[in-house]
Regions:
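Extended alpha-helical solenoid scaffold regions that build the rod-like backbones
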Residues: 145, 272-389
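Compositionally biased, long intrinsically disordered regions
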Residues: 1-133, 141-153, 158-310, 314
Length: 389
């Protein structure tokens, strides 16, 4: 039906627009249903059946979105999926059953420990009795710096910046303590570089207009879909709703490469600034910042250390795509990187079924995807993914 409208020569672009709209519609439906069931499960923590259903739906949503990223015009036509993989992982990490060594669980444990430190400090200040107990700061939590470097490696930039924002040096600097100045200056340098990490967002205006035109026509038939077809889930709405989308953003692959090279040079200059590190009296802070910076420029050993020796292969894959293989293509080195990360970390013992699904998708093997879906997901999902593939 799409191909029959207008110029027949535009059949391919219309088919792609239709595929994007279809994928977005199913994704939105899955997201809505998953969120509704997850909310019910949170209100009934003893209901194991409801918790299982919530986990299944979250995994289904993650699987669908990854299929869409790989099979529906990867990289919005560029073929480059590094940034898309990063965003997909950020949104779905908690549904991927990464285990206690995965970043979601490690971050949850860290925040709990920081909350305990804050509570104990508050109780000590109120009592005013125990002057011998050591005062602890957020950065004294056991996984503070390891979580920070993991957040940087996996592209959870806002969370990484929020975490270093808890460091005690900021308050000390504001109070005029000179010893805190070199600590804050080093952290400031890292945060500034994180904020200006280059991005690639290549979406043609004519494609946006066409998607919205077709989408509006489809959306009128069902009021509930008005935010999907031509609405909240269009490329334009997602792009324009992102406050940082036009900052340090390349609009072509060559421009992104140039932006990235210039940015890496800036990061390397900070790494090579020995005075900046030598004046920092906190060795853990200096080591944490250096590890983060080395990860940002794509040093392979730094990336592996940042995600952790016991991390899931998927975390190493995403971190490598973000920091080293920044122009990763489905038709290029994606499968090779996948195999390398699995060889390094091993397959997941927590969810072999989800592993099979994700691996088949990242290998862009449509028949393997269909086979895995038929084994591990329901008939509704299989019917819809068959339409996409």
């Amino acid at each position: 039906e799409f191909a029959a409208q207008g110029d027949p020569s535009a059949e391919s672009s219309r088919a792609v627009a239709a595929a994007r709209i279809f994928a977005a519609a199913v994704s939105a439906r899955l997201s809505e249903f998953a969120e509704r069931v997850a909310e019910k499960a949170s209100l009934a923590p003893d209901d194991e059946s409801l918790a299982t259903t919530a986990g299944y739906l979250a995994a289904s949503k993650a699987t669908w979105q990854l299929c869409s990223l790989i099979f529906v015009e990867p990289g919005d036509g560029t073929g480059i999926v590094s940034e898309g993989l990063e965003e997909w992982f950020k949104e779905n990490a908690s549904a991927l059953n990464l285990g206690e060594n995965g970043l979601p669980e490690r971050l949850r444990a860290l925040l709990s420990e920081i909350a305990t430190i804050s509570e104990e400090n508050g109780m000590g200040n109120q009592s005013g009795n125990d002057t011998t107990a050591p005062h602890m700061n957020p950065e004294d939590a056991s996984q503070y710096w390891s979580c920070f470097t993991s957040l940087v490696a996996l592209g959870w930039t806002d969370a990484a910046i929020d975490l270093v924002g808890l460091h005690s040096c900021w308050d000390e600097w504001r109070m005029g303590k000179e010893r805190a100045k070199p600590h804050a200056e080093l952290l400031e340098a890292v945060v500034a570089l994180l904020r200006c990490t280059p991005r690639l967002k290549l979406i043609d205006e004519s494609e946006l207009a066409e998607e919205e035109q077709h989408g509006d026509g489809l959306g009128d038939a069902d009021e509930d879909l008005s935010d999907i077809f031509g609405g909240l889930n269009t490329h334009r709405r997602r792009r324009d709703g992102d406050e940082t989308s036009n900052k340090f953003t390349a609009t072509s692959a060559p421009q992104f490469s140039a932006f990235r090279e210039a940015w890496v040079r800036q990061v390397q200059r900070v790494i090579d600034d020995n005075a900046l590190f030598d004046t920092c009296g906190d060795s853990e802070l200096a080591q944490g910042c250096r590890a983060a910076l080395q990860t940002m420029v794509g040093e392979e050993t730094a990336i592996k250390r940042a995600v952790g020796a016991n991390s899931n292969w998927l975390e190493l894959f995403i971190a490598s795509a973000r920091n080293k293989f920044v122009s990763l293509r489905v038709a290029g080195d994606c499968a090779a990187l996948l195999r390398k990360c699995i060889a390094s970390q091993g397959k997941s013992h927590h969810s072999p079924e989800l592993d099979e699904l994700i691996i088949s998708i990242l290998e862009a093997d449509a028949s393997a995807v269909a086979s895995a879906v038929s084994k591990h997901l329901d008939a509704w999902f299989l019917a819809n993914v068959a339409e996409m593939l």
